[in-house]
Amino acid sequence: EVPQIMKDHFTLVAISNLQLGNGKFLEGATGLILDILARKPFWDRDLNFNHGTGHGVGYLLNIHEGPAGFRWKYRKGETEVLQEGMVITDEPGIYIEGSHGIRLENELLTCKGTLNEYGQFMYFEAITLIPMDLDAINPDIMNAEDKERLNTYHATVYEKVSPYLNDEEKEWLKKYTRAI
């Protein structure tokens, strides 16, 4: 059984990961602007994680490669605009000294969305499709939108991954991507 405080923290990390991963924004935005999407669930509870929320992933999966990333604090030279095709990690976490640490990471592909009179809208597509542990989720601290994001993410995981699995593996994946 997962202790309640760990469930609550895991749930906050999941909410944070999904809020950023579902972000929509106008072309010209930087990771500095969008980082608040991931940190808000923590900051609302006077919590934080002391690392950047994400970083670029480069050619041949080189890690921690610029030019873009997500962080709340300005650093000189890290103001690159997010562009179509950029892959950036979404990896919020929480670390309680002497107790536990939790981090969830997805890689996000930056995509163009609607172009209208307001400009070019952009969005992210999760390209790391792994279920989040539902046994560690506390649905009582999630609002309806949080639950919808999790259910939509899990439906996408099942839809895209299950065609590559045998029947037994599909049953396992179905159980771990069920709606809450």
Residue ranges of predicted features:
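Active-site neighborhoods and metal-handling regions in enzymes and metal-associated proteins
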Residues: 1-180
